[in-house]
A protein has these predicted regions:
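Active-site nucleophile loop of the alpha/beta-hydrolase fold
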Residues: 76-77, 136-144, 167
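Hydrolases whose catalytic domains are alpha/beta-hydrolase-1, hotdog thioesterase
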Residues: 121-125, 145
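Gly/Ala-rich beta-loop-alpha elbow adjacent to hydrolase catalytic centers
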Residues: 114-122
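Catalytic active-site module of serine/aspartate enzymes centered on a nucleophile-bearing elbow/loop
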Residues: 96, 199-224
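Conserved alpha/beta-hydrolase "acid-adjacent" motif
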Residues: 171-177
Length: 224
């Protein structure tokens, strides 16, 4: 159970509740979108260049609760503190460890997830924290233009069922660049690192987002 002294609850609206959790990296913030009859918690964090308002995280928070999945959008301490730059990976991992008791408090299996840098954190810490599975959105396989600096080992080492959702034109790693491994991969056609698609594409932005939510809904439904 999370220490009551470490957590503050503030209800923002009927559909969302915000929770401040003290971690060894500083205060983190969880925005809960709770399912009425939840069977899973999906915790998702942001990347190094944006927040939980990202289109994929917002869409999942809107779509999944109706299907029995509570969504927890997590803001790392550096974002809560208003800093411009993300800290080192070990500090991101420290913040994620610190919020885990609050995520596990409902007593449900927790799927650890995130986009970009948040996906790396989820992969690195999944086994240690006892995550039920990992959702990796826009996994940054390598820095743009530097495929030799691969982060595949983090993905391959998650140790739990893992779904990667990747834009077809992601400069941090296109779907065809990913190595074979014990994970599932769904491509968002023409999507960039933020899953934005060009206007000339044969898929609309709304359809691209639907690829993400449909894939995650099907995958979470398959988890035992």
């Amino acid at each position: 159970m999370t220490d009551a002294n470490d957590v503050a609850h503030v209800t923002n609206a009927a559909e969302a509740t915000t929770e401040i959790v003290e971690t060894d990296a500083g205060p983190a913030r969880i925005t809960w979108h709770t399912a009425e009859k939840a069977r899973l918690v999906l915790a998702v964090s942001h990347g190094a260049g944006g927040g939980i308002e990202a289109r994929d995280l917002t869409a999942l928070a809107a779509a999944l609760p109706a299907h029995g999945v509570s969504v927890a959008r997590v803001e790392q301490p550096w974002r809560v503190a208003g800093k411009k730059l993300a800290p080192a990976p070990k500090t991101l991992d420290l913040g994620w460890r610190g919020i885990w008791p609050a995520l596990a408090e409902p007593g449900l299996p927790v799927v650890s997830g995130g986009r970009s840098a948040g996906a790396r954190v989820a992969c690195r810490t999944a086994t240690e924290l006892g995550a039920h599975a990992v959702l990796a959105l826009s996994f940054p396989l390598h820095p743009p233009g530097k495929p030799e600096k691969s982060r595949a080992a983090e993905l391959l080492g998650s140790g739990v069922p893992t779904l990667v959702v990747q834009g077809g034109n992601d400069p941090f790693g296109k779907p065809g660049e990913f190595p074979e491994g014990p994970y599932e991969l769904v491509e968002v056609p023409h999507g960039d690192h933020g899953f934005a698609v060009p206007k000339r594409a044969e898929i609309t932005q709304e359809e691209a987002v639907a690829v993400i939510t449909d894939a995650v809904l099907e995958w979470t439904g398959s988890l035992g």
